[in-house]
Amino acid sequence: MRFYKQTKRFLLLLAMLSAVSFADAQIKVEASETVELMSIISRTAGFPEYCMDNGGQYTSDTETWFSAYGQHPTVAYVKELRKNCGISYDAVMSMAVHLNTDGQKVSFTGEKSDLEKRWQKVEIDTFLVRLNQFYSDTRFHEFYKQHQTFYESVLQAYEENVMKYFHQDWYPQFYGTEPTEQFRII
């Protein structure tokens, strides 16, 4: 009888841990300051894939705030990275998701080998110096804070119109195991 109770407790504990583990692996929707930073630098540098005008007032605010920085040294540097290393499209976001900011400066949180292969030609420390120069000179964190209400409204709309209908239990059903990664929609 004692063995049965211990086994039952163990199985209950295992089930609870599995539920916690799966909850941690659920897809989270969030706004990211570093994703916005990299997108806006790319837009300011004229990357066509980042110049779509479908953001309404936010696009207008971006143009108003950052248009004075079109000749900024970081913007010129990013244009050179596109020309010489092919940093564009998904490579921009590959870097963005490996960055972190504390509101004062931007830091690299990954390993260079984690980045999209086009970044292998880039000196990351030099890139960070330039990125932080843009971040500081443009008062990017202030811009980001001023648009929190907009980001929250977009996240809420996404939750209500997409995530509400997205069945996240497909992963273990398809692969046969629980995901061990963190999935984020940024």
Where are these regions (language model features)?
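Acidic/His-rich structured neighborhood in mature extracellular/periplasmic domains
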Residues: 71-186
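Bacterial Sec-dependent N-terminal signal peptides
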Residues: 1-28
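N-terminal mature-domain "stem" immediately C-terminal to a signal peptide or N-terminal signal-anchor/transmembrane
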Residues: 26-106
